[in-house]
Amino acid sequence: MKRETVQVLLEALPYIKEFHGKTFVIKFGGSAMKNENAKEAFIKDLVLLKYTGINPVIVHGGGSEISSLMNQLGIEPVFKNGYRITDEKTMEIVEMVLVGKVNKDIVMNINLHGGKAIGVCGKDGELLLAEKETKYGDIGYVGKVKKVDTTLIKGLLVEGYIPVIAPIGFGEDGTSYNINADIVAAEIAKSLEVEKLVLLTDVDGVFKDGKLLPILSSKEAEDLIEKNIVKGGMIPKLQCAISAVNSGVKSVHIINGGVEHALLLEIFSKEGIGTMIKNLEV
């Protein structure tokens, strides 16, 4: 057992050296948030990344918590094309749950495990200027990112904090917007020009003919979408990945957040456990 431990450390060493001082944006959601064991493992992984000299920036979701509170209040959640239809009352609930509960729970868990986290949302420091998402008609206060101001994030990283970001943006008139967490993570990753964007999902990665694809170029990822090989919720995640790598992010990783220590297994091992998207042509 001791020799196995040494071997694991030796395998991780070149990656620790390579990524020391680099910034990763990690989208935390899905199974990793719902499964308590996976959640605790993720928090421990995060703190370990920080202690190895990597700068993690967390963007979180919280859809199940929002729906749970809505149901308790007698409000039925309604979705259109994967987006939560967000009227004024729903927007209040979304902001209350994401900013007031989910964000602070994550921050406290990181701090309890030896990290130093600060929770913010897109309104803080004018981080996420948003505008109404109209692609699928009027779906209420659902937004898309218009501009990212990374000043606050950079300041927190310099001071040694782990930023934890709730995906609530603000309009030019001060209106609050609910924004998809994958999109927020990708836009922040692009603005910071980070080393890695990691998207935690409920599946092991991207599949073709029943087989996990460990690595894809952005062109190959585009082909999978165009040929209808990937479907459902994986399409917007791949679109985020393609946009990120085409805008300067070195690589994007789509991994199963329900697997304990998925983050470390993907980043610090040769094989990884999910799908990595990068510009292989460069």
UniProtKB/Swiss-Prot annotation:
Q: In which pathway does it act?
A: Amino-acid biosynthesis; L-arginine biosynthesis; N(2)-acetyl-L-ornithine from L-glutamate: step 2/4
Q: GO CC annotation: what is one? A: cytoplasm
Query: Main localisation, per the record?
Result: cytoplasm
The protein's GO terms of the molecular function aspect are: acetylglutamate kinase activity; ATP binding
* HAMAP family attached to this UniProt entry: ArgB
Biological role stated in the UniProt entry? Catalyzes the ATP-dependent phosphorylation of N-acetyl-L-glutamate.
- Can you name this protein? Acetylglutamate kinase
Q: Which gene encodes it?
A: argB
